[in-house]
Amino acid sequence: MYEFLGILIYFFIALALSLLLLGLPFLVSTRKADPEKISAYECGFDPFDDARGRFDIQFYLVAILFIIFDLEVAFLFPWALTLNKIGYFGFWSMMLFLFILTVGFIYEWRKGALDWS
């Protein structure tokens, strides 16, 4: 039990410091925002439209697809570096992973998630 005491103390100090840093702005900051600070800024001109307008759902779909395939690359790099050590099981596991992602990509493509019309 005593060998984990340092980790426990570190955890509680990190938790206390995190809570302090999260709560400190609520105690120190001003309560009322200036209208100039919350207005949109467009190169020194008055804004033409509301800056907090709605985006098309297509942008969110592309962002989600980007995150999915970005994670694929994040998994592929370590796999490629350790391919000679993990053997056939690691190879076929990654091939299954890539196959599932490819099937998902084809599904998204056929459903029209990538069409901008």
Curated annotation (Swiss-Prot):
GO terms for cellular component: mitochondrial membrane; NADH dehydrogenase complex. The lineage of its organism: Eukaryota, Viridiplantae, Chlorophyta, core chlorophytes, Trebouxiophyceae. This is NADH-ubiquinone oxidoreductase chain 3. The chain crosses the membrane at residues 4-24, 61-81, 86-106. Its EC number is 7.1.1.2. Keywords: Electron transport, Membrane, Mitochondrion, NAD, Respiratory chain, Translocase, Transmembrane, Transmembrane helix, Transport, Ubiquinone. It comes from the Eukaryota. It is found in: Mitochondrion membrane. It catalyses: a ubiquinone + NADH + 5 H(+)(in) = a ubiquinol + NAD(+) + 4 H(+)(out). It is a multi-pass membrane protein. GO terms for molecular function: NADH dehydrogenase (ubiquinone) activity. Its main location: mitochondrion. Belongs to the complex I subunit 3 family. Core subunit of the mitochondrial membrane respiratory chain NADH dehydrogenase (Complex I) that is believed to belong to the minimal assembly required for catalysis. Complex I functions in the transfer of electrons from NADH to the respiratory chain. The immediate electron acceptor for the enzyme is believed to be ubiquinone. It is an enzyme of class 7 (translocase). InterPro entries: NAD(P)H_OxRDtase_bac/plastid, NADH_UbQ/plastoQ_OxRdtase_su3, NDAH_ubi_oxred_su3_sf. Pfam families: Oxidored_q4.
